[in-house]
A protein has these predicted regions:
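An accessory alpha-helical subdomain
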Residues: 193-204
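C-terminal helical/coil "lid" or tail adjacent to the Rossmann-like core of SAM-dependent
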Residues: 156, 162, 167-193
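Conserved small/polar residues in nucleotide/adenosyl-binding loops
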Residues: 205-212
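Cofactor-binding loop segments of dinucleotide-utilizing enzymes, especially the Rossmann-like FAD-
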Residues: 9-11, 30, 84
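Flexible gly/pro-rich beta->alpha loop and the following alpha-helix that scaffold active-site loops
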Residues: 25-80
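Pocket-forming structural segment of enzyme catalytic cores
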Residues: 91-172
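Catalytic nucleophile loop
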Residues: 72-96
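Short, charged N-terminal beta->alpha structural module
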Residues: 5-24
């Protein structure tokens, strides 16, 4: 019987596993992976990136990634998509990723539309957002939480989150220092807020899938 592994798909070298890092998680780069070799029996984390899910001419590997996501999600594989990963899941399953009217950046509370044990630890807390793109939900998806835009949805055995549960203080500082225009938007105690998020991110990652 094949051993189930967790494989992280990295779409951007600056966006890593962060708080979800684990020696048992195998990492693969989206632009260099043989999609046909990836077993549907494994579990996958699809990480974020600076590009849009629709930028397939500039990043042609995204088209192959979306085709693969459609196949494995429809076959019941467990996938956890983060930010760009959520947009790719939405786009691959019948939704549409697109450039939104505004940038969502900083720490914001979510509005929950459904009670779920998996996400209960995120209620009344702030999650870290950093994106300009958003998406429409696939027809078979279930919206769990949102801001003005969708933030958490489930589809078959997969979970997609638009925010960054993987963010650590180091990752935050790397992203923050690379874009001075964002600095005036953040006035929170970064360290204490991120510690709370990291705890809940790890709980989210180790929770059963929505259909278990």
């Amino acid at each position: 019987m094949e051993t189930i592994k967790t494989i992280a798909i990295i779409n951007d070298p600056k966006v890593t596993l962060g708080s979800l890092s684990n020696s048992d998680i195998e990492e693969k780069y989206a632009w260099d992976v043989d999609w046909e070799s990836l077993s549907e029996h494994h579990e996958y984390i699809i990480l974020g990136g600076h590009m849009g899910a629709y930028e397939i001419e500039t990043y042609p590997y995204l088209l192959k990634e979306k085709e693969w996501l459609n196949k494995v999600i429809n076959n019941g594989t467990k996938v956890f998509g983060i930010c760009l990963g959520a947009q790719l899941i939405a786009d691959s399953m019948g939704g549409t990723a697109f450039l939104s009217e505004e940038i969502e950046f900083g720490f914001k509370e979510l509005e929950f539309h459904k009670e779920t044990e998996i996400f209960s630890g995120l209620k009344n807390s702030k999650v870290f957002l950093w994106h300009r793109d958003t998406f429409t939900l696939p027809p078979s998806a279930e919206l769990i939480a949102s801001t003005k835009y969708p933030q958490i949805f489930t589809i078959r055995n997969s979970i997609a989150v638009q925010f960054h549960p993987e963010v650590t203080e180091t990752l935050f500082k790397d992203w923050y220092d690379s874009d001075i225009s964002r600095k005036e938007l953040v006035d929170y105690d970064v360290s204490s807020t991120l510690n709370y998020l990291i705890t809940n991110a790890c709980l989210l990652y180790t929770s059963p899938s929505p259909r278990d």
